[in-house]
Amino acid sequence: MTAEEMKAAENGAQSAPLPLEGVDISPKQDEGVLKVIKREGTGTETPMIGDRVFVHYTGWLLDGTKFDSSLDRKDKFSFDLGKGEVIKAWDIAVATMKVGEVCHITCKPEYAYGAAGSPPKIPPNATLVFEVELFEFKGEDLTEEEDGGIIRRIRTRGEGYARPNDGAMVEVALEGYHKDRLFDQRELCFEVGEGESLDLPCGLEEAIQRMEKGEHSIVYLKPSYAFGSVGKERFQIPPHAELRYEVRLKSFEKAKESWEMSSAEKLEQSNIVKERGTAYFKEGKYKQALLQYKKIVSWLEYESSFSGEEMQKVHALRLASHLNLAMCHLKLQAFSAAIESCNKALELDSNNEKGLFRRGEAHLAVNDFDLARADFQKVLQLYPSNKAAKTQLAVCQQRTRRQLAREKKLYANMFERLAEEEHKVKAEVAAGDHPTDAEMKGERNNVAENQSRVETEA
């Protein structure tokens, strides 16, 4: 029965008592949710916890009174399965449906609106009957940009509400697939933020941080959240490959949050993390290094309880972290972020040689030649022996000349085309105001013929 057929059928069942029938699909087998399939769906897949599902539905009381229908609104209803956004019976029943399936669901009050009901249409302790058609379902998008780069589908819900934070120690069992080929199967224990050293994609780590203990999920990764444009030779993954992971979070131990750490702990951990970040940077693992330096900033940025001697160490760590963040951003070609990190460093030390130089490099990379030149000139003013700044200043001036030459040529061509068009217009106007010799000769002949004709007629 299609959505249209459902609407036609409901008109003939406005007040007819509805029978209690169907297969008991309630978890407790207490006949709280009964299901009858009216039309089989297609395929074998059913929605998983967290999936976004799209349905049409009509709801009746047991006496046949219709109390709601998405068909009347001519708009499908959507919700996230298993998140408590709808009545319990729906979370249970829709999880058993296939795309295209139409079913009747009979819901006891404890799986519907309970003793309170939903005034004014649904009375207290009401048993309800729904007809539901499932149109589609899709996994949960975990990306901040909502670009579909990390999609999660939960096979088995975890326990509790706690999730791993940055720096947490996690124990996972995983399987990685490229198309249908199993390329990775491991049980690992590692610190969140260091997955790259174990050849784990950044998108998988992000997904793990959204999981609960015991959760078993499927994670789908677009190339930019997997192994990107370079692929992964170890696993024979080609460039621009989409991946699928089956991952189970067996256990985890959360890292201390900033507010849980004493000042001494923050200072101690910052020194450890700084060394780790430097090691990652030397290995060319810039994203991992970036995460380490960000930790230092988050721990020390607004901490004011240090002693005078400690404050000097904190100042040095903050300055080094912003400078190192800028360098990581430059390596990753995130030039706006590099400029921002340099600005933060220069707020701490306005004449810092590395801060000025790296900001100049970032400005140069995005063709802001005036700003780049100003930074390199200030470096040379403060540190005349800086050969790299002299070289970059020369590069900056050379590129400025090239740009001016290109602009000059562009404008010259533009003016030349405008002049040609203007000349063409003038020529056309002139041709229109002054007939050609041939046209004038033709006109004189016509006048002579007309005059001869007039004389003959006279």
From Swiss-Prot:
The modification N6-acetyllysine is found at K282. The modification Phosphoserine is found at S452. It comes from Mus musculus. It is found in: Cytoplasm, Cytosol; Mitochondrion; Nucleus; Cytoplasm, Cytoskeleton. TPR repeats lie at residues 270-303, 319-352, 353-386. One of its GO terms (molecular function) is copper-dependent protein binding. The modification N-acetylmethionine is found at M1. Residues 434-458 have a biased composition (Basic and acidic residues). GO terms for biological process: androgen receptor signaling pathway; chaperone-mediated protein folding; copper ion transport; embryo implantation; male sex differentiation; negative regulation of microtubule polymerization; negative regulation of microtubule polymerization or depolymerization; negative regulation of neuron projection development. It is an enzyme of class 5 (isomerase). InterPro entries: FKBP4/5/8-like, PPIase_dom_sf, PPIase_FKBP_dom, TPR-like_helical_dom_sf, TPR_2, TPR_rpt. There is a cross-link at K441 (Glycyl lysine isopeptide (Lys-Gly) (interchain with G-Cter in SUMO1)). Homodimer. Interacts with GLMN. Associates with HSP90AA1 and HSPA1A/HSPA1B in steroid hormone receptor complexes. Also interacts with peroxisomal phytanoyl-CoA alpha-hydroxylase (PHYH). Interacts with NR3C1 and dynein. Interacts with HSF1 in the HSP90 complex. Associates with tubulin. Interacts with MAPT/TAU. Interacts (via TPR domain) with S100A1, S100A2 and S100A6; the interaction is Ca(2+) dependent. Interaction with S100A1 and S100A2 (but not with S100A6) leads to inhibition of FKBP4-HSP90 interaction. Interacts with dynein; contributes to NR3C1 transport to the nucleus. Phosphorylation by CK2 results in loss of HSP90 binding activity. The modification Phosphothreonine is found at T143, T436. Residues 267-400 are annotated as: Interaction with tubulin. Its EC number is 5.2.1.8. This is Peptidyl-prolyl cis-trans isomerase FKBP4. Immunophilin protein with PPIase and co-chaperone activities. Component of steroid receptors heterocomplexes through interaction with heat-shock protein 90 (HSP90). May play a role in the intracellular trafficking of heterooligomeric forms of steroid hormone receptors between cytoplasm and nuclear compartments. The isomerase activity controls neuronal growth cones via regulation of TRPC1 channel opening. Also acts as a regulator of microtubule dynamics by inhibiting MAPT/TAU ability to promote microtubule assembly. May have a protective role against oxidative stress in mitochondria. GO terms for cellular component: axonal growth cone; cytosol; microtubule; mitochondrion; neuronal cell body; nucleoplasm; nucleus; perinuclear region of cytoplasm. The modification Omega-N-methylarginine is found at R373. The gene is Fkbp4. It catalyses: [protein]-peptidylproline (omega=180) = [protein]-peptidylproline (omega=0). Residues 50-138, 167-253 form the PPIase FKBP-type domain. It comes from the Eukaryota.
